[in-house]
Swiss-Prot record:
Its main location: cytoplasm. The record marks E110 as: Important for acyl-CoA specificity. Gene3D superfamilies: 3.40.50.880. It catalyses: L-homoserine + acetyl-CoA = O-acetyl-L-homoserine + CoA. Pathway: Amino-acid biosynthesis; L-methionine biosynthesis via de novo pathway; O-acetyl-L-homoserine from L-homoserine: step 1/1. The active site is at C141 (acyl-thioester intermediate), H234 (proton acceptor), E236. Transfers an acetyl group from acetyl-CoA to L-homoserine, forming acetyl-L-homoserine. Keywords: Acyltransferase, Amino-acid biosynthesis, Cytoplasm, Methionine biosynthesis, Transferase. The record marks S190 as: Important for substrate specificity. The gene is metAA. This is Homoserine O-acetyltransferase. It holds the Pfam family HTS. Substrate binds at K162, S190, R248.
Amino acid sequence: MPLIIPENIPAYELLKEHAFIMGLRRAKHQDIRPQEILIVNLMPKKIETENQILSLLANSPLQVNITLLATTSYVGKNTPFTHLEKFYKGLEEVKKHKFDGAIVTGAPVEQMDFEKVAYWEELLEIFDFLKQNVTSSMYICWGAMAALKYFYGVDKISLDKKIFGVYKHDKVSPDLLLTNLDEKVLMPHSRHSSMDEEQILALQKQGKLKILLRNKKIGSALLRDEKNIFILGHLEYFKETLHQEYVRDNFIQKAKNYYDKKGNIKYNWRSNANTIFANWLNYDVYQSTPFVL
């Protein structure tokens, strides 16, 4: 089944050659209740992030309708305002709706205290809304850090050295989200901060959080509770994304386990990304949501 997006959004041209997508006009003629997914895009380059996430959602056998949400208390300068006006809504516009699933992206603000982020108060309102009106929510990188702080009070810790590269993770707990994954799960990371691992382990002991994937050196990378998925890495990254960040940062720190001996990029996490997103849509969204929202 297709991903339903506007024909004039940039991702449409990117995906139409290799994914099953459908424009809004055609979708209206089908008598199928699609899965309603809200994407809270906190990244500065919103179009790039749209392309990454929509390409993963387009691999699902389910029909998925997308709503894009951006903060209104802070509007960045890296995305054309015309694009935001055409394709994005604010929290007030979506408050009357319920959603089957939501995805909250990362943001390049992890070195700041949460309270100093320009849109922090608005983000707390968004989290309040997701808690009450969404069947299952997925939080990515800084979005996951912010959500762990919001839901469980877990502290963010600044790192002396950036976690940057593609890391192998062990499966810690059995879960449907891990169905059909490799024994060692590869995931890109790009962050200057982490979450307090002792607090996370204590929450797991209390039965509040479940650690699904973990790396011995960098700690927990995929966690969940009954309704929320927390991903501290970037499964959505395209092949070149870490390299582009390496160039942007003036070649300061080379991404680990990312280049082969000849300097070519090893794009070896994509199947894991497709599987986790498909499992989330199937088990946590589709099979858990009521037919009438």
